[in-house]
Amino acid sequence: MSTGFFGDIQKVRYEGPESDNPLAFRHYNADEIVLGKRMEDHLRFAVAYWHSFAWEGGDPFGGRPFDRPWFSNEIDAAKLKADVAFEFFSLLGAPYYCFHDADVRPEGRNFAENTRYLNEIVDIFEKKQAETGMKLLWGTANLFSNRRYMAGAATNPDPDVFAFAAATVKTCIDATKRLGGENYVLWGGREGYETLLNTDLSRELDHMGRFLSLVVEYKHKIGFKGTILIEPKPQEPTKHQYDYDVATVYGFLKRYGLENEVKVNIEQGHAILAGHSFEHELALARTLGIFGSIDMNRNDYQSGWDTDQFPNNVPEMALAYYQVLLAGGFTTGGTNFDAKLRRQSLDPQDLLIGHIGGMDCCARGLKAAARMLEDGALSKPLDERYAGWNGEFGKRLLSGLSLDQIAGEVEAKDINPQPKSGRQEYLENIVNRYV
């Protein structure tokens, strides 16, 4: 049943590259086979409940520009929001969605009321999933917006806040499991510090390790089969976050013995804030064995903060999905559009248009990445660059020879290597040919 919010807009269809219909896909064809698998199954698109239906469009200099009929802290408004959200999911045709608890329920007076509201909405989501075929990619708890979390959740100096946050996560994991969620995400927006003058760094890291260990322990206790994911971000809102980037998260997981239990959910915008490319973070996660999922968006490269725009750079998407394919593709993860409309994009159809453009951009990137992989366009030059390590001397360097033996061979054989071209321009031109 239509809520009327989207007017007479019909379900988005694939119309091909020649279409000029802004409410149709030009490149995303869910059933198209890429590397032996349906495009939908490669990309596993998800809609973010928070940016699409809970965000009011505000910024530090102005209040909310969006006027949505569900913008109130009442359970009936939350139910209307659910109706509109699932209508949107059906129109768009993305197979998954994601949410924070605070996105979907009113803010209650206490923990018990929050839990009651969440369970009431989960009852509704269960029915709507059964009716529409929608699936939950991941759930999470909002441990950063309420003023109780000003100094963090897991890293808060007040043990009562730690306990409240832990209890909240427990209810959110329960909700995620009930809804068949394939992952559970932790993003530490307030897990960090503003100044070291009032921060016990060692204690806070240990508390964060304890918190994550409790999450993993509870996952196994209740038989939740999904993946636990950490989402790295270097700053904003906190001056310095403890889950700064993929490398930092991996070091943290290793320190607390969780590297085999937890993977990463990598957001493009957060990679940029950390001074990395999206491709770098994906490649490193793949190399370290902790690649899990993607939050897809982009930042404005001039602004210096997290702008959460829909992706529109095909070469970036091609290199990103090339790393995803090298990792073997998604298992429980997917491509969640952690992207929001611009403040002046007021019309309901703008929400569809933003997602359509993002899905088309990702589809083009995936197809280019698949062709590069099939043709060996990047792997063959890479193999040639490192070919010396496959020879007898290269293998002995990596296992068997001591430092003094290496020195002896260098002198005896008069080894005097000369540099070889890295061929960067050639490789960049190859990528441009595919996109």
UniProtKB/Swiss-Prot annotation:
Q: Which cofactor does it need?
A: Mg(2+)
State which Enzyme Commission number(s) the record gives: 5.3.1.5
Key words of the record: Carbohydrate metabolism, Cytoplasm, Isomerase, Magnesium, Metal-binding, Xylose metabolism
Q: What is its main location?
A: cytoplasm
Q: Which InterPro entries match?
A: Xyl_isomerase-like_sf (IPR036237), Xylose_isom_bac (IPR013452), Xylose_isomerase (IPR001998)
Q: Tell me the active site.
A: 100, 103
The annotation note on the cofactor reads: Binds 2 magnesium ions per subunit.
Q: Which GO terms of the cellular component aspect does the record hold? A: cytoplasm
Q: Where does Mg(2+) 1 bind?
A: 231, 267, 295, 338
Q: Where does Mg(2+) 2 bind?
A: 267, 270, 306, 308
The name this protein carries in UniProt is Xylose isomerase
Q: Which species is this UniProt entry from?
A: Brucella canis (strain ATCC 23365 / NCTC 10854 / RM-666)
Gene that this sequence comes from: xylA
